[in-house]
Amino acid sequence: MLLSMTPFPTVSTAPVTGVGPRAARSLTAEFARHNEATTALVIGADHSSAVVAAAVEALLPGDTLILVAGERSTAELLRDHITGLGSWIADRVRIVDSLAEAEPADVVVLGEPLTGTAEEARAVLDGLSKYLTDGAVVSVATPATPGRTGGAAAELFRQSALFGVGSDLVVRNQPPLRIHKLRFSRADTAKAATLAPAYRPSSVPVTRSMHIDSNGVAAAGIALGLAALARSARPASKLWLLPALAAAPVAAFFRDPERDTPTDPRAVVAASDGKVLSVERLTDERLGEGEFLRVAVFLSVLDVHVNRVPVAGRVTDYFVIDGGYANAMTAAAEHNVAAYTVLDTDHGTVGVVQRTGLIARRIVQRTPVGTLVARGERMGLIRFGSRTDVYLPADRADATVTVGDRVIGASSVIARWR
């Protein structure tokens, strides 16, 4: 990415082509999910780029978008482009001639993929510090094609391990891109309640209301690949039909439907689809002192496996407890492998625990420590089924479900804050 108008080192992107619409949407997702007045800064903006288009589309009343031209554009071209979009947008977009003229922003987006050496990438990120408000997010892309990333990709992975609040692989881009979202200072937990659920490329749309998790797309692709190989190897045989017919059911296991989340601010929503196994008060020292209200939900192999965030908050911890793989409907499941996601919320500490089962052996969690999450937001999945527990401060919440109730993730209200 050429940052020729910036006070920190230039990083070349000569071998890299542009950012497509999907990658642009991921890069600007943190700006798009804010429902309160927000300032975004796009560095390396091209007047014809998908990144500028996505940032403009995300504008709400009260927002401010600051653009710094990249090597493929100029401030004058940006001004002409924004003016042509109408006064409503032009009034909310500010174009500066150099980065030095920009003010600190809540979301900073590098408009072109970052390449070069690790030292150059580190210098770019260090140079951005003066343009970040408290809790700001930096969104940056690096090519995900082997041999074309240099040291920048390794440095971004290192930075993501320390400060990452999200990472998306966008395969449908040329070249494929890895989007890193970094937060270098703690965010205000209260802001989580004002956010919309984050856009995740891992949720692949099939229709307007039905998505498939990327795990399902990969599994279906493998099945179809096996079918193609079988047909090529034995054209006269019908053996290829077995993996071909299996592709759709395999993808269906990973279905990820869109959900309407209740607007009641006191509502706590189900973290998964399934049947309520237990509603009880207990203690769990892993989550801290005090008593918790726990609602445990069993996911059968036929239920939607994607897990949702039950309440808005900030992820403060994530850890996995080793254990067995007992049937999730039995008491022995208490000692199964369990992944704890701990949230700081306006109502105290909340825990979401994904447990393995007899069949389910794989837990996926996509909300790193430091992430602000909205209620109903996708947070991961369990392959295939098993159990998800929600822990709430017992003195601040009342259950609204009983044992045997069927619940829908992100939609069903399982408890209400007092």
What are these regions (language model features)?
Residues 74-102:
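S-adenosyl-L-methionine
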Residues 122-134:
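A short glycine-rich, Lys/Arg-flanked "PGG" loop and its adjoining helix->strand segment in the class I
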Residues 148-197:
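Class I S-adenosyl-L-methionine
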Residues 182, 197-418:
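Contiguous, well-folded functional domains in the mature portion of proteins
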